[in-house]
């Protein structure tokens, strides 16, 4: 299931009273045609201060690490924790062709971005499925490295030179980024030493810290940040609405079933990173109709255990859910550590790994497309734990280890 990472908490200051919350009613539009043009992602050609340039709005129901509010011609996005322990960052997303607000009061120090953006540099493969789902893959102009990418469409664009690699040596080529002048460079939710110089050079660095969310749906809802930047709010509402509906329907079906005991994870560098009870992994297991001995622990991150401690509590778990790219057979599992054979799930052949789709460079689609599609992950888990609830299920990410 991967190694869950902890989340901290930085609180957002109250935004100016002139802003409308995302759940507020839509303001009357003095110019429907102009507002419609804005909703379709085109620049405003005749600004009217009485027009609401966001007739299609987004609300956040699961994501907690960013907020989104509206004024008539701009949005304010605040990422509460752009990287672990960092202070909140605020972005003013101004509709192209309209005036930016004064950077005073609560907006002092905010980064102003003209939207919809036309060029994006992406630091994480998790962004790729979002822009694909939103139909704006043509706006992707840079990726950190193609090595971990699964998407054949993106790889073809890299091969053709349409998309450039800007950190292929694991360090950001600041001169290349500055020379390209992308509208936005979206981070991977961690700070990099290159971001300071890039900001000083005028590059708009926008944080995407979806991995700090504690629920799978919360992570997926960051598609709405991408939509706010690209002017594809209606599409994001449609896409996420379907994901949310399918997820909750599956969870409701699994809730009625008898819980199955699960062993999540595997050894990594001599430690077993066991997801805590408040983590997104724990939420997925519970929603799939499963349980595990550490489900009652607090915290959204993980705890490190030795294998003996895991055996003591989880030896008899019926299903083992791992995430190891190299495992294809039970023999591969045993070769990793002979002690794995002591688990009941190994003896019965119920060992699964989220490694069905691996890219040419070793990138795992579970970490690329899966972050934005928790409905597909949950579907795999339900079919694994309760196959009677999902006859004929086509697995997206998980596969069973063969004998």
Question: What residues fall within each predicted segment?
Answer:
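A short, structured surface patch at a secondary-structure boundary
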Residues: 75-178, 185-189
